[in-house]
Structures are given as C-alpha cells and as structure tokens.
Regions:
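Terminal connector regions
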Residues: 201-248
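Intrinsic-disorder/low-complexity, polar/charged segments enriched in Ser/Thr/Lys/Arg/Asp/Glu/Gln
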Residues: 142-144, 192-196, 233
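Intrinsically disordered, low-complexity Pro/Gly/Ser/Thr-rich segments with frequent PxxP/GP/PP motifs
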Residues: 171-209
Length: 264
C-alpha cells in the first residue's frame, strides 16, 4: 500500500513505538499518506553538516522550532498544477499564471496537507487588537497596521506573523489573497508585543499591461493577519482610492457610451 511503498510500513507492522516522529530530509514537498499515523513531523529540508545536532536539539527540547513552510505540501501529487502537463514534450509548461503556489490551491479551494506559512512551536501565540491607521488610502499614502501578539505558552518562542491582502474590488483576475509582508518576533512566556506593518501602494497593486506599471484599483481590500495562509487570525478592511487613469482599450464590442465615459 502507499505506506509501505514509502518506507514506513515496517514501523506499523512491528509496532515498534506508537509515538513516532518523522524527520523529513527533502528538497521539495513529498506525499505524506502516513501523516495521520505519526505523532509529529519535523521538516528539516537539506540543512548541511549541522543537521543532526540541530535536529536532536529540537527533538529533545533544547531548541524551540519557529520555521514556517515556504511552500504548500499537497495531499497528493495529482493535486499539483504541474501534474496536468507532466512529463511534457521535452519542455516544461508553466500554466498557472498568477496562481503560483498557495494562490493555486486557494483559487481551487483545494484541501492541502500543510499550507504555505505553516509551522508549529512548543509554545502558543495569541493574535489580538488589529488596528489600521486609516480606513481609506491613496496611491501616495502609507497604511500602518498594528497587531498585538502574546506568548500564551510556558516557554520562550518565536513567531512569524504574516500579512496577506485580498482585493475585493473584482476589477481584475487576482489570487484570493497574497502575502505582502511578514515579521518575526521573539516572546518570553506571557510577554506581548505590538507588531507594526507599513503598506504602500504596491501592497494593493497588480501589474497592468496596458498601463505598463503597477496599478491598485479603486475598491475595498481585506488586511489579513495570519499564522499561515490557511490560518487567518484577524481581518480588517480598508478602501483604496487611485487617481491613475488606465489607458482606454477599444475592441469591436466597445459601445459609444464607454468612449464618452473615458473622455469625461
């Protein structure tokens, strides 16, 4: 079966130990059909000569893990966007467009094994009190986002606080949300700190080919504070207003009223 084909069958057959921790040494995501049968997974990737000592320190509690996944681990290989064109005809096709990585899985509303940005710690963190410096911003404005992070566990730890932006205007085809910034903080047990993000126009923009520049459409945007791309802790809304006028592109379906609207 799948478990045996991936080298873990003997562990379950022999019932060596119910409390099994799997340490992954890999360069990219792998299928993990055995995930629900183990107590924990430590993803160390390809760390180099100090991997063994660092792994032991984490497993025995001398160090507290704080890393986050820089990629999505899918449920199975066939869930990946590249699967549809593999192995290809001596060339690779990248058909995802702007829906690369977690953006693809979000758009497809697809369940994943572990989401982009995921990573556990031996302590826990509480997110609270999100505050925006304004409810509306323009192209030249800076939006300040404050959020309070509290270490609610019993040991010191580090958390990577992630900020995603979701364009709710519907003006262009865009991902459900996009990572725009992240900040790593260290907290002692019971300690709390305010994390501050500063967002400019680029945080709300996409590249508009007709304009030949980054363009932030008029409309509402969700500011999402998260522990991972699938673990949104806090959300606030802001309105963006732009004075930039896009070039008018006429087609055979353009009506006279659209010409008049653009001229005005």
């Amino acid at each position: 079966d799948d478990v045996e084909s991936r080298g873990l069958g003997d562990v379950y057959k022999r019932q060596v130990q119910e409390n099994v921790i799997v340490v992954l040494h890999n360069g990219s995501p792998v299928e993990m059909p055995w995930n629900d049968k183990v107590s924990a997974v430590l993803e160390v990737y390809l760390c180099g000569e100090a991997t063994g000592e660092a792994t032991a320190d984490i497993l025995f509690g001398k160090a507290n893990p704080c890393g986050k996944l820089a990629e999505t681990i899918p449920m199975k290989l066939s869930d990946t966007p590249s699967y549809l064109t593999f192995p290809g005809d001596r060339h690779a096709e990248y058909n995802e467009g702007v829906f690369v990585g977690y953006r693809y899985y979000d758009k497809k509303e697809m369940a994943v094994r572990y989401p982009f940005g995921h990573g556990l710690s031996y302590t826990t963190f509480e997110y609270s009190d999100i505050k925006l410096s304004d409810t509306a911003v323009g192209d030249d404005d800076i939006l300040t986002v404050n959020v309070v992070i509290t270490n609610t566990g019993n040991c010191a730890g580090k958390e990577i606080v992630q900020l995603y932006v979701a364009d709710k205007s519907g003006f262009a085809v865009r991902p459900e949300k996009e990572l725009k910034d992240f900040i790593k903080i260290e907290l002692q047990p019971g300690e709390r700190k305010t994390v501050t993000f500063r967002l400019d126009k680029r945080a709300f923009s996409y590249y508009n080919e007709e304009l030949g520049d980054w363009y932030a459409p008029n409309g509402k945007y969700d500011i999402m504070i998260a522990s991972s791309s699938r673990d949104i802790r806090l959300t606030a809304e802001v309105t963006h207003k732009t004075a930039v006028k896009l070039p008018f592109v006429a087609t055979e379906n353009t009506v006279f009223g659209e010409f008049m609207d653009y001229a005005c």
